[in-house]
């Protein structure tokens, strides 16, 4: 998606529903109605949006939303829990077990990834594309900018339910492969992966 008229700008939270439209079909828990499924997926997304200036969206020349990318430095904070405490009140406690399992997993993998990073490294916490090719385009633009700012390496984690093989084809090196036992099924390991890519 090479287009010189595309616009990279700070992420506007009003565009969060576009991200939900993409990933709700992919990330929804098995229990609950459509409102809970959307709530749970929004909680996952918000856990990947950190309090910093490294939150971006890509628009076309007509201001149509195409993609978003979110990054985190060591020491950054995430305020998703405040949102969760307020929004979760409308759902039964047994539903919220799924949300807490997601949160535990996200925190575990974030901490594991941050532990591998130096202070001049940065983590890609999430990128979502609404249009084919827009994901690669927003990554190309943001990584070029991060490199110019002096960030040395980009880290990210993913799991076996995502297209983890994609990263091998786009300049990333696998630095850790493991199994997350709470999500394992009988005769099927739930594998996690941490990747790294040099920015400088």
Model-derived features: positions:
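Conserved catalytic-core motifs of GNAT/GCN5-like acyltransferases
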Residues: 155-157, 173-190
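Active-site rim helix/loop that mediates acceptor-substrate recognition in acyltransferases
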Residues: 33-56, 61-65, 70
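Conserved active-site alpha-helix within GNAT-family acetyltransferase domains
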Residues: 136, 148, 160-178
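Conserved acyl-donor/pantetheine-binding loop and adjacent beta-alpha core of acyl/acetyltransferases
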Residues: 73-126, 182-187
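Glycine-rich phosphate/pyrophosphate-binding loop shared by adenosine-nucleotide-utilizing enzymes
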Residues: 4-6, 62-68, 122
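A short beta-loop-alpha structural element at the N-terminal edge
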Residues: 4-21, 73-74
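Conserved acetyl-CoA-binding loop-helix of GNAT-fold acetyltransferases
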Residues: 131-145
């Amino acid at each position: 998606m090479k287009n010189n008229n595309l616009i990279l700008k700070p992420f506007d939270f009003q565009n969060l529903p576009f991200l939900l439209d993409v990933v709700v079909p992919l990330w929804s828990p098995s229990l609950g109605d459509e409102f809970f499924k959307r709530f749970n997926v929004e909680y996952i997304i918000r856990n990947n949006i950190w309090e910093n200036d490294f939150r971006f969206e890509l628009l076309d020349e007509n201001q149509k939303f195409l993609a978003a990318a979110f990054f985190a430095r060591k020491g950054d904070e995430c305020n998703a829990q405040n949102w969760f405490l307020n929004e979760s009140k409308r759902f039964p406690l047994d539903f919220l077990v799924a949300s807490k399992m997601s949160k535990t997993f996200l925190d575990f993998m974030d901490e594991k990834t941050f532990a591998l990073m130096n202070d001049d490294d940065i983590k890609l916490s999430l990128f979502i594309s609404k249009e084919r090719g827009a994901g690669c385009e927003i990554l190309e633009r943001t990584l070029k900018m991060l490199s110019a700012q002096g960030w040395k390496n980009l880290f990210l984690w993913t799991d076996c339910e995502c297209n983890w093989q994609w990263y091998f084809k786009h300049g990333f090196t696998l630095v850790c492969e493991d199994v997350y036992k709470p999500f394992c099924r009988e005769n099927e390991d739930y594998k996690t992966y941490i990747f790294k890519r040099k920015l400088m």
